[in-house]
Each structure stands twice: as structure tokens, then as C-alpha cells.
Amino acid sequence: MSEQKLALNEYLKTDSDYLRGTIKEGLDSAVTGSFSDGDQQLIKFHGFYQQDDRDLRNERKEQKLEPLYSFMLRARVPGGICSPQQWLGVDKIASTLTSSNSIRLTTRQTFQYHGIPKRNLKTIIQDLDREALDSIAACGDVNRNVMCNPNPVESKLHEQAYAVAKQLSDHLLPHTRAYAEIWLDEEKLLSTEDETVEPVYGKTYLPRKFKMAVAVPPDNDVDVYTNDLGFIAVAENGELVGFNLTAGGGMGSTHGEVETFPRLADDFGFIKTEDVMKFAEAVMTVQRDWGNRVNRKRSRLKYTIVDHGYEKFKAEVELRAGVKFEPKRDVVIGDRGDRYGWVEGVDGKWHLTLFIESGRIKDLPGQTLQTGLREIAKIHKGDFRMTSNQNMIIAGVAAEDKATIEGLARKHGLLGQVLTQTRGHSIACVALPTCPLAMAEAERYFPEFIDHIDALQAKHGISEQAIVVRMTGCPNGCARPFAAEIGLVGKAPGRYNLYLGASFEGTRLNKMHRENIQEAEILAELDTLFGRYAVERDAGETFGNFTVRVGVVKAVIDAAKDFHG
């Protein structure tokens, strides 16, 4: 591979002085609202992407103006937990320093801001820092935000799992001081030897993004098998004893390029809790050294495992960790949804899960979600937990405070919505107008689409059945559409590829059923299938399993061979 020309990003990273580039100079320039092409790649490591309003792109071009550039900043919040005080700071930033005046909960248990002008970036990062929050490594070719099941029922086990997720996040952060120097005005230290700057990542970091999740069975809301590296908690007598390790998952693909495909992770075996950091670092460094740095479309860990082989990869990980895998332990992987409403934990505290459609927290007529969460944060004594289904848990509520919290939630439209089983299990990415990769709508259209799905389920008498439905504006897969029982992936404005056949639990991918079709065709197809499902399903059979059993689509067993075939 050394004889081949590397991907451009590899040269950018090498020459960036550990992610500094010319970001500071670009930030100081008032000539444009943009950064240079090279710095646009480097700023991802600092937690944000350059975007523009695509709804206004043609109009501004006609006016001979540059695109209306803005930035999306994503925070690093391992496990999705923040304090009410932190949330008040997060809310204030959204209300005063962004044009969207909203907060977007993501599918990886954090939040992001849209519509940030370049001049406000530094202020926002400094304001986040005052709340002990940051955006380091929220994007870029590094370990991203580490997910962990909120699981507020098993509080003790959750806290143990969360501690591991937090440790993973902290241990695998980049060591460069570029973030602190550029955004927090820290003085630059004298240059040191390369290997001491980034002992794990090295000068070129990873070949591509790297995603981790910690799952606490039976819940699988973190979609553990869709991650590069997963840790499935194993408990004995309610105490965490270790994890089943999974590796090689990832959703992204490219339309029309069969060498790219989504993939679910492989099971590698059981590891003890004290060995988690050894194995995490081992998997990451194998990917660092073996991953494809020539073709970024084939650079995720899933392709490294496919190209080198499972056994070879496993042996190298064991060698670097200095520990061998034990046989995986039996665990039950179940529901990927959230528990809406009040749930009592084993510690006697109560937890209120609020449905936030597509994760968008914004004040609208009759539904003042942002104000509601702000008012709750002012009085709440527990914490806020963001879920990977883009929802919010008001966690750790004392019994005597329940009525007050619930009253505020109802007053501001955070409770009381008509929520079907399917809507509660469905998510969408942002897509248009801000995402530069989007080929079709997702977040703005998704609520209307789910209305149609709800109506079809009611028509056929299957409203009680939860169906996992996900929509993205492109095949990069941010809302994990290839692990949905019904997946819609944007192909062109108003057109989507329809995927069917994933398992309800997230242990099998779906497969394309129809390509490049419009809403009417999608709904007609689902109308027919829902009719069959209502009559022909076995007792307890989920929709995804049904579509495979009756031959609507073939089961994807080996994604490298089956997904496109």
C-alpha cells in the first residue's frame, strides 16, 4: 500500500502539525465565512463541519454572493449524560449564538448545533468549556462519542457500564493541544517528539472515523452491532464482570459502488472489565496500522476485517492486548426502543423518558420543547440523559418531585403526544437543508411519512406492532437505516431506496427491495406488505423477520457477499 498514492486527507493530517493547520488564520479572516479546503477537513477533529443553506444556494449564486456558510458543531458527551446546569448552558448557546435557535439530539447520544456563523465558533467552544463540555473528537478520523445504554432501571449496572464508557472516551482522546490553543487561547508548548504527542494515534490518526458503544442487555438502543467496536455488558448477580466484544460494524456505503456496504460487527469473545482498555487500544491500533489509507470509501474497520480475515485480525488483537478472548457469554439482545414515560429504578428514583421527534429541540406553537426543558433544568436535581433514539430522559427524580416535573413537561408539549409504537421506534437524520451530503429530505419530511405508516398500520389492524423505521438523506447511514426493518435511503429529491428485512433487535441487516421510488410507490408497496403481514404472520413474528420468511427479501448473512447480491 505504501507504493500507492494515499488519500488526500492523509497528507493533510501529516502536514497539519497535529490538527492545527491554518485554522487559526482562517478563523481570524473576515473576508469569507468559510475555511480553506484543507482546514475544512481538519476542523472536523475539533468537532464541527462547514455547511451552507442549500435552500438559498441558487438564490445567492444569482446574487453573486458566496454560499450562506455556517457550521454544525457536535459536542462530546460520553454516554449522553449531562447535569441540569450544563443543559442550561447548552440551551443558552442555542438561543443566543446560532441561527437555528435549536438543539439537535443525535443518534449517538449527544447534541449538536446548526447555523453557527464562523465568528461565533470560538465563543461557543469557550462557553461549552465553562460548562465542562467540549467538542474534541466529536468528528474526524478518531474515536467518536462513546455511547452507553441509559438503562435507568438497573441503575447500579448502568453506572458501572457508564464508567467504562467514560473511561474509553477519556483514554482514547487525541492528546494534541491544538484544540486548547486555537479555541481556549492556551499557550503553545515547545515542540516535542512526534510519538509523545499522540502515543495511540500517531501523526496520521486513524484511516477513518471510529465508533464505539457499550450495551447493557437486554436493551440494544445503542445498536451495538452497527459500531466499529462494541462492548456488551455481562453481569453476574447484578454486578458487571466483563463484556462480549464485537468489532467491524458500520453503516456507510456509496450508491452504485458494490465494494462498499453496511456491515454488522462480528462477535470476538468475552473479556474481563479490567482488560477493556487493552482490547480497545489493540483494536484501534490494528485499524490504525492495517486500515486502508488509499481509498477512504474502504477505510472503515469493517473493510479491514473483511480484507484481512476474521482469524488474522483476532490473533493480532490478542497479541497487542496481551490477553486472549474467552468464549463469549450468553446474553439476550432485545428491544432497541426507549421506555417512554415514567420508570422506577432499583434505587427508588424515577426516570421520565420524553419523545423528541427527530431529536429537534425547538419552540414551536403549542409545543415549546426548548422552553420546557429549560424550565425543568432549573429545578431538576438529577441528570439529563440523551438516548441514541434522539430522545431525552429526565433521570433521578425523587418521588416527591414527580408531579412538578410532569406538570412542566405537559405544559410545554413534552408529554401528551399521541405516540404509536412505530413512531416511538423510528429515527431520521438531519439531511436538507444543511447537510452537504443529503440527496433527499429526512428530518423535515419524516414526521409526515410516519403519519402515513401509522395510517397504514391502523388500516390493517397492526398498530400494536412496533416496526423500526429509519430514514436518511444519503447512504452514509447516520440514522442507521440499514439496520431498520423499513429503511428509506435518499437517492434523489423525493426519491428513496426501500430496504426491508432487518431484525427488530438489530442483529441482521436489511436488503434493498425497491430502488429510486417516490412516496406513492413506497406507500403502495408497504400497504400490500402490511396487508400480508396482518394475515400471514406467525405469533410474535416481527415485520422484518416476516419479510425474510415469506421471501420478500433474502436474509443478509454475510454483508460482503449478500447485501448487494
From Swiss-Prot:
Catalysis performed (reactions): hydrogen sulfide + 3 NADP(+) + 3 H2O = sulfite + 3 NADPH + 4 H(+)
Cofactor: siroheme; [4Fe-4S] cluster
Keyword terms, alphabetized: 4Fe-4S, Amino-acid biosynthesis, Cysteine biosynthesis, Heme, Iron, Iron-sulfur, Metal-binding, NADP, Oxidoreductase
Bound cofactor: record note: Binds 1 siroheme per subunit. Binds 1 [4Fe-4S] cluster per subunit.
Residues annotated for siroheme binding in this entry: C478
Pathway(s): Sulfur metabolism; hydrogen sulfide biosynthesis; hydrogen sulfide from sulfite (NADPH route): step 1/1
EC number: 1.8.1.2
Record GO cellular component, one term: sulfite reductase complex (NADPH)
Residues reported to bind [4Fe-4S] cluster: C429, C435, C474, C478
Short name of one Pfam family: NIR_SIR_ferr
Listed InterPro entries: CysI, NiRdtase/SiRdtase_haem-b_fer, Nit/Sulf_reduc_fer-like_dom_sf, NO2/SO3_Rdtase_4Fe4S_dom, NO2/SO3_Rdtase_4Fe4S_prot, NO2/SO3_Rdtase_4Fe4S_sf, NO2/SO3_Rdtase_FeS/sirohaem_BS
GO biological process: cysteine biosynthetic process; hydrogen sulfide biosynthetic process; sulfate assimilation
One term of GO molecular function: metal ion binding
Class in the EC hierarchy, top level: oxidoreductase
Quaternary structure, from the entry: Alpha(8)-beta(8). The alpha component is a flavoprotein, the beta component is a hemoprotein.
Cited function: Component of the sulfite reductase complex that catalyzes the 6-electron reduction of sulfite to sulfide. This is one of several activities required for the biosynthesis of L-cysteine from sulfate.
NCBIfam families hit by this protein: CysI, PRK13504.1
Family: Belongs to the nitrite and sulfite reductase 4Fe-4S domain family.
Official protein name in the record: Sulfite reductase [NADPH] hemoprotein beta-component
Name of encoding gene: cysI
